[in-house]
């Protein structure tokens, strides 16, 4: 089975990986996808290893935005999904308040075991998604 799938500069893990050495180049992203990374020798990270949450959806008119998905969980715990926003209120006379944007999902978990970590330009990131924008007021 394949360890990774690739789309442009983004490599996505499909299972736990056991590597002798692993190098992530500049301007390259490894989406850990909630799986573990074991490196017997050196992990050289000049790109990004990440498992971010996803952004919440925007409110539309007086309808609530949806919550964003949490970071992926493969063999590790997934991030928590964000909750949906509230519906816009209604005032006598017909004015509707805008719906609230959904909350972003939390980042997932990253697990790395390596004898040596190297690289000066890379990073490891588990970041929550942004909240969605509120909807517009309706007359």
Question: Whereabouts are the PLM-identified features?
Answer:
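Glycine-centric low-complexity/flexibility signal
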Residues: 1, 34, 40-139
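Extracellular beta-sheet-rich ligand-binding/adhesion modules
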Residues: 1-42, 109-114
């Amino acid at each position: 089975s394949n360890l990774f799938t690739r789309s442009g500069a983004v490599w996505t893990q499909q299972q736990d990986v056991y590597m002798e050495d692993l190098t992530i180049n500049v301007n390259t992203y490894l989406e850990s996808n909630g799986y573990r990374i074991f490196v017997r020798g050196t992990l050289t990270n000049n790109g990004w290893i990440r498992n971010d949450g996803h952004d919440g959806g925007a409110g539309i008119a007086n309808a609530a935005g949806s919550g964003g998905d949490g970071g992926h969980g493969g063999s590790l715990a997934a991030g928590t999904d964000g909750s949906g926003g509230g519906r816009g209120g209604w005032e006598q006379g017909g004015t509707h308040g805008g719906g609230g944007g959904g909350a972003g999902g939390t980042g997932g978990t990253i697990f790395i075991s390596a004898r040596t970590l190297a690289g000066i330009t890379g990073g490891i990131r588990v970041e929550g998604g942004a909240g969605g924008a509120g909807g517009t007021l309706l007359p």
